[in-house]
Amino acid sequence: MSITAERKTALIKDYARGGTDTGSPEVQVAILTERIANLTGHFKTHTKDNHSRRGLLKLVSQRRSLLDYLKRKDEGRYRTLIERLGIRR
């Protein structure tokens, strides 16, 4: 269910703003989006897994908060990020 270290490194490389950037909102949102996609696939076969569903809602809320922050600070970066990730908004 969790993302592999290689996939996480690839996401960091793709969305980083600088060479060693791992904490920018873009990177965090990309990693959260990957985790959300994995959990969504999990629920296709495990529909009654309510403990994990609570974790999914927490991840979605965290991603929403980061996106709101990014929209407040720099709307251009926000727009390009949601287009790259294919997030509805």
Curated annotation (Swiss-Prot):
<comment type="function">
    <text>One of the primary rRNA binding proteins, it binds directly to 16S rRNA where it helps nucleate assembly of the platform of the 30S subunit by binding and bridging several RNA helices of the 16S rRNA.</text>
</comment>
<dbReference type="InterPro" id="IPR005290">
    <property type="entry name" value="Ribosomal_uS15_bac-type"/>
</dbReference>
<dbReference type="GO" id="GO:0019843">
    <property type="term" value="F:rRNA binding"/>
</dbReference>
<dbReference type="InterPro" id="IPR009068">
    <property type="entry name" value="uS15_NS1_RNA-bd_sf"/>
</dbReference>
<dbReference type="InterPro" id="IPR000589">
    <property type="entry name" value="Ribosomal_uS15"/>
</dbReference>
<keyword id="KW-0687">Ribonucleoprotein</keyword>
<protein>
    <recommendedName>
        <fullName>Small ribosomal subunit protein uS15</fullName>
    </recommendedName>
</protein>
<comment type="similarity">
    <text>Belongs to the universal ribosomal protein uS15 family.</text>
</comment>
<keyword id="KW-0689">Ribosomal protein</keyword>
<comment type="subunit">
    <text>Part of the 30S ribosomal subunit. Forms a bridge to the 50S subunit in the 70S ribosome, contacting the 23S rRNA.</text>
</comment>
<dbReference type="GO" id="GO:0006412">
    <property type="term" value="P:translation"/>
</dbReference>
<comment type="function">
    <text>Forms an intersubunit bridge (bridge B4) with the 23S rRNA of the 50S subunit in the ribosome.</text>
</comment>
<dbReference type="GO" id="GO:0022627">
    <property type="term" value="C:cytosolic small ribosomal subunit"/>
</dbReference>
<keyword id="KW-0694">RNA-binding</keyword>
<dbReference type="Pfam" id="PF00312">
    <property type="entry name" value="Ribosomal_S15"/>
</dbReference>
<keyword id="KW-0699">rRNA-binding</keyword>
<dbReference type="GO" id="GO:0003735">
    <property type="term" value="F:structural constituent of ribosome"/>
</dbReference>
